[in-house]
Amino acid sequence: MANKFTREYKLVVVGGGGVGKSCLTIQLIQGHFLDEYDPTIEDSYRKQCTIDNEVALLDILDTAGQEEYSAMREQYMRTGEGFLLVFAINSRESFEEIRIYQQQILRVKDRDSFPMIIVGNKYDLRGERVVSEQEGQALAAEFGTKYIETSAKTQHNVENAFYDLVREIRKEDKKLGEKVGGTSFANNNGAVKQMDVGDEDVQAGCCAKCIMM
């Protein structure tokens, strides 16, 4: 086994209620689809993986989409390093909310741009689509971000969405001249840990869940 430094990436999944944020996260972490909708308050998950031959520890915060929890948004927006902006392609309202999330993130970060990916979820329901792929791409171009369509049910592009966000954070690190940094949602004691990582460990994932009441 060789010692390697493992970078932790603080990813935040945001979007309106019922768009499939939790389903995307659970599909990535545990490899199964949630059949029943149970509104999330705030859940945190961790997964170790390899992206472009580099080991990464994903620290993923799955957030509440319901309006009654909107007061919590600025707290996680301050600490996130990258954001998945999720809407459902069969919901025009959820698509229109993406701009609100993007503007709030930039305001909290006091930045003109920040690592984000726009995600059009529920691709398996594309027969009920009310938001075209072209509209999603146009909004992403306006924001200077990528657009990807996913299905938590069929696993379509689920890994790609999260992994592309990590790639965007790496680009930001390089642009800012940062080698490593950040903290963890799970323990807040530092983002970079020296770990013994072997070939058999690289694909292993771990999950820790906590609900903030």
From Swiss-Prot:
Gene3D superfamilies linked: P-loop containing nucleotide triphosphate hydrolases
Family matches, as SMART domains: RAB, RAN, RAS, RHO
The organism of origin for this protein: Neurospora crassa (strain ATCC 24698 / 74-OR23-1A / CBS 708.71 / DSM 1257 / FGSC 987)
GO molecular function: G protein activity; GDP binding; GTP binding; GTPase activity
GO biological process: signal transduction
UniProt gene name: ras-1
Keyword Nucleotide-binding: yes
Subcellular location: Cell membrane
Family: Belongs to the small GTPase superfamily. Ras family.
Lipidation (S-farnesyl cysteine): C210
EC number assigned by the record: 3.6.5.2
UniProtKB keywords: Cell membrane, GTP-binding, Hydrolase, Lipoprotein, Membrane, Methylation, Nucleotide-binding, Prenylation
Residues holding GTP: 15-22, 62-66, 121-124
Function of the protein: Ras proteins bind GDP/GTP and possess intrinsic GTPase activity.
Keyword Nucleus included in the entry's annotation: no
InterPro entries (UniProt xref): P-loop_NTPase (IPR027417), Small_GTP-bd (IPR005225), Small_GTPase (IPR001806), Small_GTPase_Ras-type (IPR020849)
Pfam families xrefs: Ras
Residue numbers bearing the Cysteine methyl ester modification: C210
Chemical reaction(s) catalysed: GTP + H2O = GDP + phosphate + H(+)
Protein name listed in UniProt: Protein ras-1
Motif (Effector region): 37-45
Positions of the propeptide segment: 211-213
